[in-house]
Each structure stands twice: as structure tokens, then as C-alpha cells.
A protein has these predicted regions:
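Surface-exposed assembly/interface segments
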Residues: 1-277
Length: 277
């Protein structure tokens, strides 16, 4: 930032002979629907893209959102429950909970490009069909592969915070950036381990886990921002599953004569919880 004063700025009459280049090129590591370039597998290989269309071409689409329906005692004191409908006598609650899903890379890419992102690298370390979260050994291999790409300036593993190996993965990210000395790691503070955990406890735990090495090569952004990239067309009855194989009696939750209980019974009576891809 300049201090107050008078400055002389000379404007060139000739066009700029220097070609503009991207100053921030991130590398994203995570789980994708697939990883294919025609007949060639892209699994574990850094792949350069410039748009969401290219991401979908090589790495597929989004994981299917799933919300779990259940009936339990009222009041509801579960942070995973998005909302609940009380029964007429107030003793029961029909709950709609967000199902834990470790696959978030796709939505991070949507946000990246929607906010002006351009050139980046993708390294797929697994698929939705495998049903497993990010594996730390595969992340280590992906980081080793990124050593050959000198233009990368940031490293991101969006799904690391949702795995029990978060500490090790983030440590490896910092070590990689410290070794390369031309990039830094963007880290996430893990979600609450328990409902009554306060913000200071989360931060202290994060600082302990990342250790004391290569801290100048990383940045953590906190608290989390609640947002959504889903549209109306992404939400319909197919995203709801029961937490049990049989449907409970729903008549106490709706007015007499309501068609909703019958609708739920016919639609979801044989829908056990499952992660779909």
C-alpha cells in the first residue's frame, strides 16, 4: 500500500510484451466418480484442467446426496439432524439427518470455478464406488507425483478433515510444501468431535495435530462456512432413506386424512440406509 503523496506513473504506448500467467495454480487431491482419459486411467496421476466441464469429462459427476429419516424421542439434541417434525402429543419426532459422506471434492471444484478459479491440477486417489474415505498412503503417493509439476502453488485435500487420518495427511501436506518451497498447503480444522466441544478446543486440537514443522508453508481457514451448491433439481424423494428396513407409523406426525404417511410407506418402506454413487 502506498503512502499519501504525489506519484508519477508513465503509461507505455506499446502493448505489453509479457504474456500473463496464472499466479495461483492449486492441486486438488481427493475422491472422484472415476478417473479416466479415454482408455487410460488417471488414478493417482496429476491432471491439468481449466474448467468444470473438463473435470466432469475426466473425473465424472457428483456423489448422490443422501438424507436419513428416522423416528425417535423428542426433543432432538443431535447436531446431524437438519430438522424434525414433532408428533401431535410432542413425545416423538420425525427426524431428517444429513448422512455422513466423505466425498466432497466435486462440490469444492464447483465452488472453485464458480468463484473465478481457472487452471488447476486434479489427482484422484479413489472412487465413490470403493466407498472409502481418502487414504493417507494414496495421498502420500499423490504428493510425490506432484513434485514433478513445478507450476503448482497450492495443495488442497478437501476431504482430509472428514477422515481419522487427518493429522497424518495434513502433516504430509506441510512436509511436501516445505520440501518444494514453491507452494503452500490449505488446511481445514476438523469438525467437532462432540456436540459440546467449543471453538477454542477445536483450534487447540488442530494446532497440536499439525505440529511445529513447516508451518510457514500452510494456512488454515476457520470457522467453516455453511453453503450449498445443490439446486432444486438435485433434491427429490430419491435422496431420502430410512435408517431401518421397515417404516414406522407416521400418522402421529400429520393431520388426520393427510396422504403423507401413505406416501412415505409406499415409497420408502424397503429403503435401507446405503451410500449411493
Amino acid at each position: 500500500m502506498k503512502t499519501p503523496g504525489v506519484y508519477i506513473v508513465e503509461k507505455s504506448a506499446f502493448p505489453n510484451s509479457v504474456v500473463e500467467a496464472a499466479t495461483a495454480i492449486p492441486a486438488f487431491i481427493g475422491i472422484t466418480e472415476n478417473a479416466q482419459n479415454g482408455p487410460d486411467s488417471l488414478s493417482g496421476k496429476p491432471w491439468k484442467i481449466t474448467s468444470m466441464t473438463e473435470f466432469q469429462q475426466y473425473f465424472g459427476g457428483a456423489p448422490s446426496p443422501v438424507f436419513t429419516l428416522s423416528v425417535g424421542e423428542a426433543p432432538v439434541e443431535d447436531e446431524k439432524v437438519l430438522f424434525s417434525i414433532p408428533s401431535s402429543d410432542g413425545t416423538k419426532a420425525l427426524k431428517v439427518a444429513d448422512t455422513e459422506n466423505p466425498f466432497s471434492l466435486y462440490y469444492n471444484m464447483v465452488m472453485f470455478f464458480a468463484n473465478g478459479g481457472g487452471t488447476c491440477y486434479i489427482v484422484s486417489v479413489g472412487t465413490y464406488a470403493e466407498g472409502a474415505p481418502v487414504d493417507k498412503e494414496k495421498v502420500v503417493a499423490a504428493l510425490a507425483a506432484l513434485e514433478k509439476e513445478q507450476e503448482i502453488t497450492m495443495v488442497v485435500v478437501p476431504e482430509a478433515a472428514s477422515t481419522p487420518d487427518c493429522k497424518d495427511i495434513q502433516g504430509q501436506m506441510l512436509a511436501h510444501c516445505g520440501k518444494m518451497m514453491n507452494r503452500f498447503a490449505i488446511l481445514d480444522v476438523q469438525p467437532k468431535a462432540k456436540a459440546n466441544e467449543v471453538m477454542s478446543e477445536q483450534i487447540d486440537k488442530f494446532r497440536t495435530n499439525v505440529g511445529a514443522n513447516f508451518l510457514s508453508y500452510g494456512a488454515a481457514y476457520y470457522p467453516w462456512l455453511n453453503t450449498s451448491v445443490l439446486s432444486d433439481k438435485d433434491i427429490d424423494g430419491s435422496v431420502l432413506v430410512w435408517d431401518k428396513s421397515s417404516t414406522p407409523d407416521l400418522t402421529p406426525f400429520f393431520a388426520p386424512g393427510s396422504k403423507f404417511p401413505k406416501y412415505f410407506e409406499e415409497t420408502y418402506s424397503i429403503s435401507p440406509p446405503a451410500r449411493r454413487s
